[in-house]
Amino acid sequence: MKKKFQLEVPGGADKVLLHTCCAPCSSAIIECMMQHHITPVIYYCNPNIYPQEEYIIRKEECTRYAQSLGLEIIDADYDHENWRCHIIGMEQEPERGGRCLRCFKLRLLETARYAHEHGFSVITTTLASSRWKSLEQINEAGQYATASYADVTYWEQNWRKGGLSERRIAIIKEYNFYNQQYCGCEFSMRKEE
């Protein structure tokens, strides 16, 4: 993949804690970061994923990709029940609604906490690569998450541009990644009526 745009990491950091939702969404982002001499440390924090078997499959694919590139992957605890407690009353919200925003805030707040405790100055997320998610909500959640930690900055980056979407498709084929058909939670599995 050629460098199609310049990445400007806040503070010029060369190491970033990358909240990762799945291997397909993270693949081109990780490759792009590495080509720009940025080392991503993959943070797999996805208590929203249902069922747990799905969580494990996605985690294993992230691990396989990280290991193939010699990158560190950190697995946050899977606590789906705690996640459910945080979204009570929002179960019927549509995709891109309030439930998604609350979910993003929860996951990115945990990412920011980990970054603060382990010396990372910058976090970003692969959620910003999905055309199915609101970039505005993701950035709001990232800013919310880092507001409590003066030493951690959220890196707003539109990972849908610069040829990354096309490269993502190629990497999925190259690695034969499992490519799920829903965001992750049981509520995103609902069929459109």
Regions found by a protein language model. Give the residues of each.
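Nucleotide-activated chemistry modules centered on ATP-dependent adenylation/adenylyltransferase
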Residues: 1-193
